[in-house]
Amino acid sequence: MREEKLLTSLGAAIRKRRMALKVSQEAFADLIGMHRAYYSAIERGERNLTLGTLHRVAKGLGVRMAELMRDCNI
């Protein structure tokens, strides 16, 4: 999978999980201690996440990082 497609797919998986929790981007970004604009770029697939950042996002969503990877067929 190309990196751009991977990041877009991961961002969509993260967005889907956040929306299922009925939490706004701003509220979620605050919850995980991240600036909203940066978090928004993650959901759009415009940021290459470090493992640490992916872990913060997954923890905020209440899932394991592996579950997010499965959501986007990695």
What are these regions, as identified by a protein language model?
Residues 12, 36-37, 51-54:
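Short alpha-helical elements of helix-turn-helix
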Residues 22-44:
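Short alpha-helical DNA-recognition segment
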Residues 1-19:
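A short, Lys/Arg-rich alpha-helix, primarily the initiator
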